[in-house]
UniProtKB/Swiss-Prot annotation:
Belongs to the MinE family. This is Cell division topological specificity factor. Prevents the cell division inhibition by proteins MinC and MinD at internal division sites while permitting inhibition at polar sites. This ensures cell division at the proper site by restricting the formation of a division septum at the midpoint of the long axis of the cell. Keywords: Cell cycle, Cell division. It holds the Pfam family MinE. GO terms for biological process: cell division; regulation of division septum assembly.
Length: 105
């Protein structure tokens, strides 16, 4: 159910079949634009590594429990990343930032 459908339902309006058909067609077209065959194992591994590199700058990750996968449901494909966080590194980031760039007096 889209936000528009929810608003229409709350206001007592019925969704026309034309609008429903248009929304379904938009979903199909969006799905067709994504060429899933181009997402090779090598590309997924590269994406996984880059995502982990970025997230690891800010939090400590339990790398043994990381899971990255492609999930398809109702004509929609999602890249799902489950990254268990051990702790945040914000204090260490601030410390490094202050000591790497000392203010001149």
């Amino acid at each position: 159910m889209t936000l528009r459908d929810l608003i229409n339902k709350l206001l007592g309006r019925e969704t026309s079949s034309a609008n429903t058909a248009r929304e379904r067609l938009q979903l199909v077209l969006a799905h067709d634009r994504v060429d899933m065959s181009s997402l090779t194992t090598d590309l997924l591994d590269k994406m996984r590594k880059e995502i982990l590199d970025v997230v690891a700058k800010y939090v400590e990750i339990d790398f043994e429990e990381v899971a990255v996968s492609l999930e398809t449901e109702d004509r929609m494909t999602a890249l799902v990343a489950n990254l268990p966080i051990k702790r945040t590194l914000t204090g260490e980031i601030e410390f490094k930032k202050n000591h790497d760039n000392p203010k001149k007096k």
